[in-house]
Amino acid sequence: WHFGYKAHIGADTDTGLIHTLETTAGNVSDVSMTSKLLTGTEEEVNGDAGYVGANKRKDAITRNKFGKKIKYRICRRPSTLKKLSRSGQYKARKAEYRKSSVRCKVEHVFGVVKNLFRCRKTRYRGKAKVDSQLKMVFALANLFLADTRYGLQA
């Protein structure tokens, strides 16, 4: 049998620390989890191409708790860049580079979890057990990242 799970995370762009974790089956799309990952205090949302159209969904959160409009900065799919003219491609690639430089903070957390804590494959069968394992590992990753970035001392 084959089974897989996804860890959808919401991370703070300033600190790079995780504030939300949702575990789903592997066949659940990223864009369907967007509203569950937001805390309500965001001013902008950054995501990869898997989140295209997140602001147009029925369950999309368009305003934060303070009434300000949330800016969705989602990377474009590479195939849409090929359709542009040469000068348009140059400008679009620069804009995509700026978006992905913010998004790399989230990807860095996944690198810590996979490489430092060796959490590459699921060790359990069942969503509840996998969810518990991922919450523990991501909490440890938060502690590790906070310690390396801010030098927290006991």
Which residues fall in each region the model found?
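Helix-centered, glycine/charged polyanion-binding patches within enzymatic domains
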Residues: 43-44, 49-132
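Residue-level marker of positions within ordered structural domains that often coincide
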Residues: 14, 118, 144
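Aspartic protease catalytic domain
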Residues: 135-144, 149
